[in-house]
Design a protein with these regions (language model features):
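Basic/polar N-terminal segments that are highly enriched at the extreme N-terminus
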Residues: 1-2, 101
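A structure-centric signal for secondary-structure junctions around beta-strands
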Residues: 2-4, 49, 91
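Short, structured motif recognition centered on aromatic/hydrophobic residues
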Residues: 4-9, 20, 32, 51-56
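Short, surface-exposed ligand-recognition loops at beta-strand->loop->(often short) alpha-helix junctions
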Residues: 11-23
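Non-catalytic surface loops within mature trypsin-like serine protease
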Residues: 12-14, 60, 98-99
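An amphipathic, aromatic/His-enriched active-site/gating alpha helix that lines ligand/cofactor pockets
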Residues: 22-40, 57-94
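Short beta-strand micro-motifs enriched in acidic
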Residues: 44-47
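Short, low-order "capping/linker" segments at domain edges
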Residues: 93-101
């Protein structure tokens, strides 16, 4: 089984980078970790305060899809930071690559 890394890149609403990072740091990333998702890195881009990234690692493509489906359907996510996070994102891009540890 080939491990994979998922890179998410977000274009945030103007001026919301600091707020978004606070939500990620205190709400979203802890939820990811509680769900068994390995978060490798996350934060505000060095070149733009309203650009954000999230890197997550999974044991394979099938595991990634199963884990993410369960996570995004969970009450903890739906009743937690979901609405505020989604509201702050103007655009998102996703890339999945093989992970060499």
């Amino acid at each position: 089984m080939t491990k994979v890394v998922e890179i998410l890149q977000y274009r945030l609403q103007a001026g919301s980078g600091e707020r978004f990072h606070h939500i990620m740091q205190h709400d979203s990333v802890p939820l990811h970790q509680a769900a068994g998702i390995t978060v490798l890195e996350y934060g505000v881009s060095l070149h733009d305060p309203d650009a954000y990234y999230l890197l997550r690692r999974f044991d394979g493509m099938v595991e990634m899809e199963q884990v993410l489906q369960a996570f995004y359907r969970s009450q903890a996510w739906l009743e937690g930071p979901r609405t505020e996070i989604v509201t702050l994102i103007d655009e998102s891009h996703r890339v999945v690559l093989p992970y060499q540890s």
